[in-house]
Amino acid sequence: MFIFKRKKQVEMPLEKIPAHIGIIMDGNGRWAKKRLKPRVMGHKAGMDALQEVTIAASGLGVKVLTVYAFSTENWSRPDDEVKFIMNLPVKFFDKYVPELDKNNVRVQVIGDTHKLPKATYDAMQRACLRTKHNSGLVLNFALNYGGRSEITNAIKEIAQDVLEAKLNPDDITEDLVANHLMTNSLPYLYRDPDLIIRTSGELRLSNFLPWQSAYSEFYFTPVLWPDFKKDELHKAIVDYNQRHRRFGSV
């Protein structure tokens, strides 16, 4: 059992640590605007926040941390911003992977990665290769990821198996669909997030893990992502500890 010490408050036990946490990292641009800085500086600060949160989650015993790094819809942003964001994984992996490796963190990526710029793709591959034998927390980047696209592709794969008589339609189950989703590479027990956190005060999923989040608990905070550090993660988990997950039952 972990003990979280809140400032000027009593110690709060963390008896339930969510095995899989998903984070929609939102608010980088607004963080920069408040400080009269270019939007790209908010993305850079967000990268530093991710490193701190990852190490904190690993220390708490979280098994999987899935972070929404870049959606399929984000390509519509200004070209200069997209170019900068695409370079962030290169900087993140080069700067922080040695420390993540020391903490037994394994890096993994889901999304349509073949459409990424070569430098981004290569940096991603290097990070995954370096950490592939680690047995600790899985840092799962959703990069060029879209939930509806993921489900659509799963349906196409299953339909093709039916067309080729490899599969009977009556044999299609929820587990079968899940096995065709990008999260099928995660440990079976941890594929679906127990807790999804969204920063910046927005109250929506934005196409993030729509299938996998069916029974997730949600935590929305007005804190902008670059300001979401170790203490904010603890607050989210304290809130999670106060929930009673019923999974549709009473």
Swiss-Prot record:
| Positions annotated as active site in the UniProt record | D26, N74 (proton acceptor)
Name of the protein described by the UniProt record: Isoprenyl transferase
Q: Which family does the record claim for this protein?
A: Belongs to the UPP synthase family.
Task: Give a yes or no for keyword Transferase in this entry.
Answer: yes
- Is the keyword Magnesium assigned to this protein? yes
Q: Assembly and partners?
A: Homodimer.
The domain of life is Bacteria
The protein's matches in InterPro entries, at most eight in alphabetical order, are given as: UPP_synth-like, UPP_synth-like_CS, UPP_synth-like_sf
**One of this protein's GO BP terms?**
polyprenol biosynthetic process
| A GO molecular function held by the record | magnesium ion binding
The UniProt annotation places substrate binding at 27-31, 39, 43, 71-73, 75, 77, 198, 204-206
Organism of origin is Streptococcus agalactiae serotype V (strain ATCC BAA-611 / 2603 V/R)
Catalytic EC class: transferase
Cofactor(s) recorded in Swiss-Prot or TrEMBL: Mg(2+)
Which cellular component appears as one GO term in the record? cytosol
Enzyme Commission designation: 2.5.1.-
Residues binding Mg(2+): D26, E217
Cross-referenced SUPFAM superfamilies: Undecaprenyl diphosphate synthase
Sorted keywords for this record are:
Magnesium, Metal-binding, Transferase
What the record notes about the co-factor is: Binds 2 magnesium ions per subunit.
Describe the task this protein carries out: Catalyzes the condensation of isopentenyl diphosphate (IPP) with allylic pyrophosphates generating different type of terpenoids.
Name of the gene encoding the protein in the UniProt record: uppS
